[in-house]
Each structure stands twice: as structure tokens, then as C-alpha cells.
A protein has these predicted regions:
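Short alpha-helical donor nucleotide-sugar binding micro-motif in glycosyltransferases
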Residues: 96, 263-264, 271-276
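A conserved mid-protein helix/loop that constitutes part of the nucleotide-sugar donor-binding site
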Residues: 207-223, 229, 240-246
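A short, well-ordered alpha-helix in the C-terminal region of glycosyltransferases
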Residues: 254-257, 342-357, 368
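Short alpha-helical segment that forms part of, or immediately flanks, the ligand-binding pocket
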Residues: 270, 289-297, 311-312
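Aromatic "clamp/platform" in nucleotide-sugar-dependent glycosyltransferases that forms part
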Residues: 284
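Conserved acidic donor-binding segment of nucleotide-sugar-dependent glycosyltransferases
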Residues: 316-327, 336-341
Length: 374
């Protein structure tokens, strides 16, 4: 079987291997276990510097078709896009003609072009992993909405399984819940009650960017500390906000409360989650909130905003604490939970839910997508 992957992930070619964003490549290597050849249509980075977050495909037979990246964020970029889009469209058509199974990674500008191209192959087996927020009531770019509209339309999009995060009402028959995973079956642990009589350990794992709201996270912990609650916040991840966050911690005398570690190995984050009481992520938007699911896997109670499928993951508050993205309200909601909720029951429910979705199960689910029966 020849598997075609169309995605926006910028790749690096070095020493005959192709590298990309590690969580994406790690999953695509699972798809590769069941196919004879992989065809990738994606952009290539101009530099060949491999970052810690990059990983290589492990399949022996990979063909790569480079396409230009584009955006429509300015008049000049929109003008250039008019010349790039036809090139991408034709490249997608050629690659799709060669493939036995067409797999799109949405949302993204290149995948939008691919969404249109796949219409011309109604009889080929197809799948789409929609790695963004599928919530029909959320505020999203019109290009994302257009991709969702095309994918939902069973006349335009035939023979396609659309894999989305969470369960959503009133969807077309080709929209299917599909849960990503980080840990294997043999990494499961038994639930162990924790002592919530302080000090309380919180973990933030994510990019230090505006969308993840790391400033709000620190301010929540600061406010809890000022209320006399013994708390510690361990932050894993890097990004453009790191200098400002470090300065805020120093200026406000939080050096013994907030600890910024930057990017760390997966094993370091895992150990911290196993030891922590809470996992906090007050994001503006999420596709699959990976960090939340990872904490839940070890009985770490999630504290998160109800974006995307988070409310579904947290059982509308039975498996975690849902907060609003406003400081005083969020702090009040957390304090209420600390005083009134059965935290052990909440942590146990979080662990049991997340441990349903292992990497082993993900591999079986992928096999089911590739070899779906008519």
C-alpha cells in the first residue's frame, strides 16, 4: 500500500532522512508500520538544523514532494499565494493519483488545497486527521471553517474518515472521534491517593506563547500563594515569552514558588506529572490538549479552560477543574474545588479515563482506518 500524507509540517532533509515535529512524526511512524511506501507532500525548511523537538521518519521507503508554504496575512503574501496555490494543487493531484490511501493533516493552508484536490478522487480510500478545534461553536479562521465544511460534506468528500478530537452532536456519518496518545499500555500505573493538605504541586507543560496563557497560569499560582495556600508551579516548555516570565517571577519575588525549566526530556516531564497534584493549562484554544491528557494518565488533576474538547475530556468537571480565563474567577473556582471537591475521586476518574487511550490502542485504531471495510 502507498500512503500519501499531505501536511503543513515543515520538514528538514539531512543525510538522506526527513525530520519533522516529533509528536507528528511519532504518530506517522505508526501509520507507516502498515504500508509499503510513504509519499509526503509538505514544505521543507531552508536550514538543516535539527532541533530537540524534531524526529525522523523510520520508514525505509519515503518519497518527498516539496511544496511552497503560503499565507494570506498581508496583501503581498496574498499576491504570492495566487502563484503558489496552483503549484500545490497540481502536486497534490499527482501525488493522490499515485496513492492507495490519501491522508490529510488538517487544518492548514496546504491541507485546504488538498481538501479541494481530494474531491477529484471519490473512489480512493481517504482519511483526515483534524488536529485542530472541531467545536462548531468556536471562533475560528474562515479557512478552518471552509476545511470543516468540505470535510463534512459527504457529496464532495467521499470514502473519507474524518478523525476529530472529542464527540460532537449532529455530525455527518464520516466524522469520527479519534484520540491521540503519548504513553504505552505498560506505562500505566495504579491509582495512588495523594495528600492534598499542602504543599500543592502544579505542572504547566506547553509552549510559552500567548495562546497557552502562561502569564495567567503564574498569576493564578501567585494569587493562591497570597491567600496563604502553599503552592509550587513547575513550568516545562520554551517560547518567546520566556524572558518576560522570568522577569515577572523575579520582580514579584516568586523564585521559591514558580520554577521555569525550559524544554525538558519527555521522561523529566513524566516524572514531574507523576509527583504533582494538578496539571494546569488555561489555553485560549486547543486541538488535542496533549498536556492535559498526559497529566490525567498519572492521576494528576487537570485544571483547564473549557475550549475544544476539554469539557468532554474532563467530564464537565467530574474529572478535573474547569476554569474561566479571568484571574479572580479562575482562582475562586480552584479554591472552591480545593475546599469542597472529592479530589481523590476526581484524580482517579481522570486516570481511568486517560488510561483508556494508550499508544497501543492508537496503533490499532490507525490500522482500522487504513484497512476499513467497505
Amino acid at each position: 500500500m502507498k500512503l500519501l500524507i499531505v501536511c503543513i509540517v515543515k520538514h528538514i532533509e539531512k543525510n538522506g532522512k526527513y525530520y519533522g515535529y516529533a509528536p507528528y512524526v511519532r504518530e506517522m511512524n505508526l501509520w507507516g508500520n502498515y504500508v509499503d511506501e510513504i509519499i509526503v507532500v509538505a514544505p521543507i525548511k531552508e536550514v538543516d538544523i535539527i532541533d530537540e523537538i524534531d524526529s525522523a521518519y523510520n520508514h525505509a521507503h519515503i518519497r518527498f514532494t516539496q511544496v511552497p508554504n503560503f499565507n494570506i496575512l498581508s496583501v503581498w503574501e496574498t499576491f504570492k499565494a495566487f502563484f503558489k496555490i496552483p503549484v500545490i494543487f497540481v502536486q497534490c493531484l499527482f501525488a493522490m493519483a499515485k496513492a492507495d490511501h490519501i491522508h490529510l493533516r488538517c487544518p492548514g493552508n496546504i491541507s485546504l488545497v488538498a481538501c479541494v484536490a481530494q474531491i477529484f478522487f471519490p473512489n480512493k480510500k481517504k482519511s483526515t486527521k483534524y488536529a485542530g478545534n472541531w467545536d462548531p461553536n468556536s471562533n475560528q479562521p474562515w479557512t478552518y471553517r471552509l476545511q470543516q465544511t468540505i470535510l463534512r460534506n459527504t457529496f464532495l468528500t467521499r470514502n473519507m474518515q474524518v478523525l476529530v478530537y472529542g464527540e460532537w452532536p449532529n455530525e455527518t456519518r464520516n466524522i469520527q472521534p479519534f484520540i491521540s496518545a503519548t504513553y504505552y499500555e505498560d506505562e500505566k500505573i495504579e491509582f495512588q491517593p495523594k495528600d492534598y493538605t499542602q504543599p500543592l504541586s502544579f505542572v504547566f507543560a506547553g509552549a510559552l506563547v500567548i495562546g497557552k496563557r502562561p502569564f495567567l497560569t503564574i498569576q493564578i499560582i501567585e494569587s493562591l500563594f497570597q491567600k496563604g495556600i502553599s503552592v509550587r508551579l513547575h513550568m516545562y516548555g520554551d517560547g518567546p515569552l520566556m524572558p518576560e516570565l522570568q522577569d515577572y517571577v523575579k520582580r514579584n519575588g516568586l523564585e521559591t514558588v514558580v520554577f521555569l525549566y525550559g524544554n525538558q526530556d519527555k521522561s523529566v516531564v513524566k516524572a514531574s506529572l507523576m509527583d504533582a497534584h494538578f496539571n494546569i493549562l488555561p489555553s485560549k484554544s486547543e486541538g488535542w490538549p496533549k498536556a492535559v491528557a498526559e497529566g490525567m494518565f498519572f492521576g494528576c488533576i487537570p485544571i483547564a479552560t473549557p475550549v475544544s474538547c476539554v469539557g468532554w475530556m474532563l467530564g464537565d468537571g467530574t474529572r478535573g477543574i474547569l476554569i474561566e480565563p479571568e484571574l479572580e474567577t479562575a482562582v475562586s473556582q480552584i479554591v472552591t474545588a480545593l475546599n469542597n471537591a472529592d479530589l481523590d475521586a476526581m484524580a482517579k476518574a481522570a486516570l481511568e479515563w486517560s488510561q483508556q487511550y494508550t499508544f497501543d490502542r492508537l496503533e490499532e485504531d490507525i490500522r482500522g482506518v487504513l484497512f476499513v471495510r467497505d
